[in-house]
Amino acid sequence: MSPLSDSKRSIVALALIFCSGGSFLFAQEQSATPASDQRDLFERAVAQAESTAAISHQLKDIFQRTAKAVVKIHGVDEHSEICGTGFFIDPTGTLYTAYTVGGEAGNFTIEFGGKKYPARQLLADIRSGTAMLKIDAATPTLSIGKSEELGVASPVVAIGYPLDLPETPNCGMVAGFDQKYLGRYFSTTHLRVNLPTQRGEAGAPLLNMKGEVVGIVVSRLENTSACYAVPIEAAEKIRSDFVRFGEARHGWVGINVSEAAQPVEGSRAEMTQIMDDTPAARSGIKPGDILLQVGRKRVTQPEDVLNASFFITAGDTVPIIVMRGDQRMIFHVQATLHPASRTGVMVASPATPLNQAIPLSLGSEVPRTP
């Protein structure tokens, strides 16, 4: 973006001085300020004006490029009408949304491009808190980014349909990466974002400053101006399962971990139980082994096992790296289907953080926790 012209710089800078520093002008009458100080004030005002203009331009560009791929979703469940947000992820009409929007409702209608389309559910996964719907139309798409590149204070943008209003951008920043909430564990690390959300914004895409999707808004924190978003990698894992198998296949190896007394190779995740007749038991992993890595995910504390385990797919062989004494060992374990996937029970005791999930409701009076 080209810099502001000298005349515009002066106008904007003076406007800022008048708006935010009226007392300064009054003080000028009381005591003279050196010309160098006046110049410094002017330059700071100019820099602030240029920075504000640049941010405004960037946000406007992101909204204009991405809003056309963000849609309003209507559905009906056994209690009431559901209204939420979704976004297209391929040019053939496939879209992501939150489980609270597309998971348990039916008779979906998508508002897109000034028209309404019937939609069908492809997949609903309560563990990730996401759902996939599809319409029969050619559609724009959003680019997929990497939530792993975000840090605390990274700026983000959500685009949704709050309170049945037109598409609306909402700007905030990443406040944290949480593995649990109120003592209960998420199935995978969630992004806590300083974004106030309203009814209708569940399923909204969370975008980085490149306009790439890095998360999906799935829940709001009551009595706060914050929300949770599931990382886009979690939704992509579920999508990959669907492409391969037609369903989500959450893997499981059958281990319990707790915090070791001392770190070993940077990890405090100690195997405390190897469940009988499980992939881990058959592989040779033993209690007392210190877990270093599951698949591609590094483990440094017991809670990391939740995030690593989420990305295991049943039927796949997963490399698991451990320390046994002073020996580094690699086990290739073929994961089986997670017991919760068979029983439908997705939330376990807070004392045993084993692949729990909290599909918190957002803007809905109907409890969604199973």
Residue ranges and their predicted role:
Residues S2-V12:
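Bacterial N-terminal signal peptides that target proteins for export
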Residues A13-S23:
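Bacterial N-terminal signal peptides
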Residues S23-R39, D61, Y96, G114-Q121, ...:
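C-terminal recognition in membrane/secretory proteostasis and scaffolding
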Residues Q28-F88, T94-Y99, N107, T130, ...:
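N-terminal activation segment of mature serine protease catalytic domains
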Residues A69, V76, A131-S143, T168-S225, ...:
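Active-site region of chymotrypsin-like
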Residues K72-C83, F88-T168, H190, P196-R199, ...:
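Conserved active-site neighborhood of the chymotrypsin/trypsin-like protease fold
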Residues T92-T94, M209-V213, G288:
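Short, glycine-anchored, charge-dense loop/turn motifs used at functional sites
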Residues Y161, Q179, A204, D276, ...:
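Short, conserved catalytic or interaction motifs in soluble domains
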